[in-house]
């Protein structure tokens, strides 16, 4: 027997409705409370009664829950409506009375996130955990483009601060979207590159001032912000570039909360200022007492004879106030800093004390798992005025991603904060160089009203020999520095051997006198007086050095030290360089990319010993982007410069990695890093141009086999007609994936960034894994070479050192082919014709280049792709090669929404629409990159990889693929953006890539041309001397680019 269930329908009697509501309301709220506790979920329940009374329950603050879970930018979370419940529970009458239907709707309704963090990605006011996750997704997702796609969604969901992450993912979006968009925007954000170069500088500062990255991030989260900054750097570029639209849109979500937080910050900053003034008074009193003591010791010294000075120093080791002129300067600085502090109040930035905790910041802001998004103290606001200076405790040290440097992925340098680099020793325990202190490797800083450093002049008592007047500068080197009671000041005294700081981004050549000095400060190229000063500081008498160090301790109140270091460590140095030696600035910007990532490692990190090449080598745009990217361009660097940096980071990281642009440019140089390597020669190599151009140009004409590609796309207005395309695989260029391995090798930073810059660099190709997949595609042809590099469709036939294709080189059974190895049809040219105007027909003719081996020729493979049918005309009396179908899965290319990756990696993965993303595991990426290293040895095969890695825009000219997305083997309609027009010149065809290759002399042109090439096929085609009509190529590109842009 069972009770009869009440029919779920409206109670007709009004009184009964009132009674039922009263009874069940309390039970409903009780169940909601129990559910929130049992399942550790957040519940906000609002019940409206019939008499307009509001009953609500919330496991946390109601308003924040509503904002977090209701204001979603997209439908990543399944929202159940009343219709869903009615659908499940509305048919109870048809069921038996004995059935227990309580759980009937569990499966039908599906699961919704139950944990408090389940929907963080949907949180518009993204918390640091979201940012970290998205950044990790970006870092991890750089290995996985799918994750990048998800990150795009997640970051878009996280918007606000994940706007930056959104731009991280939009960096991945910029890498992917910008490789999709910035494939129009790599190509366009090659505008972004040029803009990123500008945005690199502008967006650098804009991020410091305008980017809402970390506006709600607590100090303990600041070390986590670096990844966000990497993305946020791109966000700045993205904000400055196309991403700024989404970022601005996303940023609009929590604007009111930010305004409220700003007001709170102003109030609290005023309180902090009052506390600071009180402490300042105490400090002045103490300073006065110390000054009196100093005078007493000086009087004693005068009575002690010629040796009294040294004796005085021994007496003053624990009491060493500064000389009066230096004291006046510091007082002037203090007044400047106090003015800056007044200005900070207007910018809602509280003061951070030596322990890294804000004076204004309640403990709940750091204790809350959500980071309390409205916390007034943020790394962005702090970095805006540089409040935090060097005062973070070891776990919070603002460390610029040295790992990111080569890629320009020091994007985290937006806030100058990043997670500690992997390969750095004790960097967490070391303080960044104090540029505004005599012992910090620099001179006292003077700030203007906005907190930026004014041009520095040596102090009046500054001795040209490196010391101050009255100091013995010719005394022997200092002993071990004295340990002070203040551990943070002690860290400042310790030699700092970390490269991750901003000045480490400049080329070691300019710093060589100072780089490995005892002081260890990798400061930016210095004014000659600074260099003398830094070199002689440690040559002064040991006691003098201790005296100066203690003067720093006594003169600077613990808070004063922070305020004196208000400048963002990177902005501070960046503007010092602009002001001190503008004539050297471009040179440094051209060079520091190559070198900065080598600061803590041997110059042969790329196994290319000339990495520290002459300053002229780096392409100015790439370098400027790198400089902008590395300096603040790192801010831009990641994504729009990862869009740019996809070209630029690829160019920048490709400076060492210069994967797409430079390596495509480098494709001549067998060292993939050849921008860096070419740069190594201290020259911009036309070899890149020659090898790129020469790859196609120098290579002998190869046998082209007309292949008919039948492609089903009834509704693809984006594909113009093109009569046929042939695959030219010949190229000398070092495959991009020396860059991958160069990325992995070039920069362990890039390896750190490899997830970002290897992948971001590969993200130029949208080839995080596509780089690996480009590697994979490269590895596919590596089957030709080492069964690792699958270069373009068949083989790089030209001057590559790799063996030509022969039946023995091809494993028809493909067991040795790793999942990452996927045969790829790379560059497509109109049937070997010099060319006709780019036209795409539904039936495309794919011609496969077969290299000549001796006097014998191997016939083309007969291969069919689904839906691309490749029919190779069989030549009589020639043995046939294995069919590429042996290597291909059934690939359905969806040119409208998504393209699917083959099931090598466990199934089909949806990727953003556009060319097929060949994503793989990081392990396969490593192996692929190693394969690419093999391909690096097999430079020529990898040259096609350059094209492969090149997103068409960054495609190395030698690369056979015209696939702008760099996704070889993906002939989706969107992949043909650059299947154009000057396919004749594969060098030129990758147009942007060719420009890169051609413009390897000018990687700016490579990036700009890649960017402009992507932006303007006219430029690329024109620059590439493509025969295609620039107007038509432009139009076709615009049509393609529009089709490639992700739909909101």
Swiss-Prot record:
Gene Ontology biological process: cell differentiation; positive regulation of transcription by RNA polymerase II; regulation of gene expression; regulation of sorocarp spore cell differentiation; regulation of sorocarp stalk cell differentiation
Protein name: Transcription factor mef2A
Predominant subcellular localization, coarse grouping: nucleus
Keyword field contains Transcription regulation: yes
Function summary: Transcription factor that regulates cell differentiation during development. Seems to negatively regulate prestalk gene expression and positively regulate prespore gene expression.
PROSITE patterns tied to this protein: MADS_BOX_1, MADS_BOX_2
Cited InterPro entries: MEF2-like_N, TF_MADSbox, TF_MADSbox_sf
Phenotype upon loss of function: Leads to slower growth when feeded on bacteria, fewer slugs with lower migration, decreased spore production, reduced cell differentiation, and slightly abnormal prestalk differentiation.
Region feature (Disordered): 74-263, 294-339, 386-812, 916-1048
């Amino acid at each position: 027997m069972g009770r009869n269930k009440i029919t779920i329908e409206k109670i007709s009697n009004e009184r009964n409705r009132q009674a039922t509501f009263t009874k069940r309301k309390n039970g409903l709220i009780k169940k909601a409370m129990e559910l929130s506790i049992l399942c550790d979920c957040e519940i906000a329940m609002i019940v409206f009664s019939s008499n307009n009374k509001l009953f609500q329950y919330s496991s946390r603050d109601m308003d924040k829950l509503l904002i977090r879970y209701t204001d979603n930018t997209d439908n990543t979370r399944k929202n159940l409506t009343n219709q869903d419940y009615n659908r499940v529970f509305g048919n109870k009458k048809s069921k038996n009375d004995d059935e227990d239907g309580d759980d009937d709707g569990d499966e039908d309704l599906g699961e919704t996130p139950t944990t408090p963090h389940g929907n963080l990605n949907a949180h518009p006011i993204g918390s640091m955990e979201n940012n970290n996750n998205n950044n990790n997704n970006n870092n991890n997702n750089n290995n996985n483009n799918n994750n990048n796609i998800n990150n795009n969604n997640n970051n878009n969901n996280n918007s606000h601060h994940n706007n930056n992450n959104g731009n991280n993912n939009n960096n991945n979006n910029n890498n992917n979207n910008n490789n999709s968009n910035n494939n129009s925007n790599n190509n366009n954000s090659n505008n972004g590159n040029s803009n990123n170069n500008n945005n690199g500088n502008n967006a650098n500062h804009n991020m410091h001032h305008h980017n809402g990255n970390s506006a709600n991030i607590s100090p303990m989260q600041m070390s986590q912000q670096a990844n966000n900054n990497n993305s946020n750097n791109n966000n700045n570029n993205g904000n400055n570039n196309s991403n700024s639209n989404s970022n601005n849109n996303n940023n609009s979500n929590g604007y009111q909360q930010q305004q409220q937080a700003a007001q709170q910050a102003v109030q609290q900053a005023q309180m902090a200022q009052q506390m600071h003034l009180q402490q300042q008074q105490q400090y002045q009193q103490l300073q006065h007492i110390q000054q009196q003591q100093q005078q007493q010791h000086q009087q004693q010294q005068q009575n002690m004879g010629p040796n009294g000075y040294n004796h005085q120093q021994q007496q003053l080791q624990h009491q060493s106030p500064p000389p009066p002129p230096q004291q006046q300067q510091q007082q002037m600085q203090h007044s400047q800093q106090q003015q800056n502090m007044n200005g900070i109040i207007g910018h809602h930035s509280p003061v951070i004390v030596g322990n890294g905790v804000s004076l204004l910041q309640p403990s709940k802001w750091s204790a809350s798992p959500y980071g309390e998004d409205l916390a007034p103290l943020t790394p962005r606001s702090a970095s805006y005025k540089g409040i935090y200076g060097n005062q973070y405790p070891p776990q919070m040290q603002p460390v610029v991603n040295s790992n990111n440097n080569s890629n320009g992925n020091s994007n985290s340098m937006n806030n100058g904060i990043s997670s500690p680099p992997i390969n750095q020793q004790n960097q967490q325990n070391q303080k960044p160089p104090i540029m505004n202190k005599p012992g910090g490797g620099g001179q006292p800083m003077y700030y203007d009203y906005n907190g930026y450093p004014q041009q520095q002049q040596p102090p009046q008592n500054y001795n040209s020999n490196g010391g101050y007047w009255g100091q013995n500068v010719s005394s022997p080197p200092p002993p071990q520095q004295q340990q002070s009671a203040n551990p943070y000041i002690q860290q400042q005294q310790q030699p700092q051997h970390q490269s991750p700081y901003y000045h480490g981004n400049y080329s070691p050549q300019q710093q060589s006198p100072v780089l490995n000095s005892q002081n260890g400060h990798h400061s930016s190229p210095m004014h000659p007086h600074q260099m003398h000063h830094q070199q002689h500081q440690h040559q002064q008498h040991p006691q003098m050095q201790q005296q100066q160090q203690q003067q720093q301790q006594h003169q600077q109140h613990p808070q004063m030290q922070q305020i004196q270091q208000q400048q963002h460590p990177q902005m501070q140095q960046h503007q010092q360089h602009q002001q001190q030696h503008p004539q050297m600035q471009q040179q440094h910007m051209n060079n520091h990319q190559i070198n900065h990532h080598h600061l803590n490692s041997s110059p042969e990190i790329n196994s290319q010993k000339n990495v520290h090449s002459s300053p002229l080598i780096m392409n100015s745009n790439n370098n400027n982007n790198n400089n902008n990217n590395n300096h603040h361009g790192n801010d831009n660097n990641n994504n729009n410069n990862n869009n740019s940096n996809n070209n630029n980071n690829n160019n920048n990281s490709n400076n060492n990695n210069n994967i797409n642009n430079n390596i495509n440019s480098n494709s001549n140089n067998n060292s993939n890093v050849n921008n860096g390597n070419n740069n190594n020669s201290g020259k911009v190599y036309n070899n890149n141009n020659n090898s790129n151009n020469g790859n196609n140009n120098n290579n002998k004409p190869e046998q082209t086999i007309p292949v008919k590609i039948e492609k089903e796309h009834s509704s693809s207005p984006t594909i113009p007609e093109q009569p046929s395309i042939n695959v030219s695989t010949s190229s000398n260029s070092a495959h991009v994936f020396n860059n991958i391995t160069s990325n992995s090798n070039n920069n362990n930073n890039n390896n750190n960034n490899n997830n970002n810059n290897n992948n971001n660099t590969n993200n130029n190709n949208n080839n995080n894994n596509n780089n690996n997949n480009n590697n994979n595609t490269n590895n596919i042809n590596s089957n030709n070479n080492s069964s690792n590099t699958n270069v373009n469709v068949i083989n790089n036939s030209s001057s590559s050192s790799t063996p030509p294709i022969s039946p023995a080189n091809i494993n028809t059974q493909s067991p040795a082919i790793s999942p990452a190895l996927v045969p790829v049809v790379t560059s497509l040219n109109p049937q070997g014709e010099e060319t006709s105007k780019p036209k795409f027909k539904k039936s495309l003719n794919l011609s496969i280049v077969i290299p000549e081996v001796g006097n014998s020729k191997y016939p083309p493979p007969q291969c069919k792709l689904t839906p691309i049918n490749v029919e190779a005309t069989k030549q009589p009396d020639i043995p046939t090669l294995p069919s590429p179908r042996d290597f291909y899965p059934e690939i359905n290319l969806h040119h409208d929404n998504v393209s699917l990756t083959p099931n090598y990696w466990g199934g089909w993965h949806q990727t953003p629409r556009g060319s097929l993303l060949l994503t793989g595991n990081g392990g396969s990426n490593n192996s692929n990159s190693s394969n690419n290293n093999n391909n690096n040895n097999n430079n020529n095969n990898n040259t096609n990889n350059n094209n492969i890695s090149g997103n068409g825009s960054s495609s190395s000219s030698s690369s056979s693929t015209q696939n702008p997305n760099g996704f070889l083997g993906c002939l989706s309609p969107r992949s043909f953006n650059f299947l154009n027009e000057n396919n004749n010149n594969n060098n030129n065809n990758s147009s942007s890539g060719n420009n890169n290759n051609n413009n390897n002399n000018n990687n700016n042109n490579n990036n700009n041309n890649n960017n402009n090439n992507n932006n303007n096929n006219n430029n690329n085609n024109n620059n590439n001397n493509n025969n295609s009509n620039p107007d038509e190529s432009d139009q076709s590109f615009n049509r393609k680019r529009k089709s490639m842009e992700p739909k909101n």
